[in-house]
């Protein structure tokens, strides 16, 4: 019956998740029970593109080792666009103009360290010659899309493929929120 179907759907909807979304902790000071929510960490990455040089790829100092787009974590109280510009300056020395949002990438396995959710921008360097590795980048260089170094970490190969589709006119960018 419809009522039985609705009841089963409701039970299925309220079934426990495979991975816990929260855990119960005890406050060491007062002994009260508190809930810690296990949310993805907000991050941002930027495909910095110069038509003559290609895209900026960094070689990572920290685990996982390999090559990646420059990016990092959004600080508490920080607008994601500001975090993107800050991270580019820290990792590449470049002052970047954000052209638009390529996409949001949030697969739980995209980063082996923890679940992250990245807002990925396409950016243009104001002075491409200022490129220099910094922060947690061993090296930073421009690479043509057809000659990227390997291995590419995280889901950045997928992001770069999406960027290639944007360059080919097969994808659009979402606007950047004004500061």
Please identify what each model-predicted range represents:
Residues 132-164:
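NUDIX/MutT-family hydrolases
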């Amino acid at each position: 019956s419809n009522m039985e179907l609705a009841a089963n759907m409701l039970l299925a909807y309220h079934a426990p998740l495979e991975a816990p979304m929260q855990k119960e902790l005890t406050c060491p000071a007062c002994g009260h029970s508190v809930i810690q929510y296990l949310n993805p960490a907000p991050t941002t990455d930027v495909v910095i593109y110069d038509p003559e040089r290609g895209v900026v790829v960094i070689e990572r100092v920290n685990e996982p080792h390999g090559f990646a787009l420059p990016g990092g974590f959004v600080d508490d109280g920080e607008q994601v666009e500001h975090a993107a510009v800050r991270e580019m300056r820290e990792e590449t020395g470049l002052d970047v103009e954000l052209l638009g949002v390529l996409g949001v990438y949030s697969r739980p396995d995209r980063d082996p360290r923890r679940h992250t959710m990245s807002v990925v921008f396409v950016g243009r360097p104001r002075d491409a010659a200022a490129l220099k590795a910094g922060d947690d980048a061993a090296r930073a260089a421009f690479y043509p899309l057809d000659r990227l170094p390997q291995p590419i970490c995280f889901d950045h190969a997928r992001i770069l493929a999406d960027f290639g589709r944007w360059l080919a006119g097969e994808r659009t960018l979402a606007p950047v929120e004004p500061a």
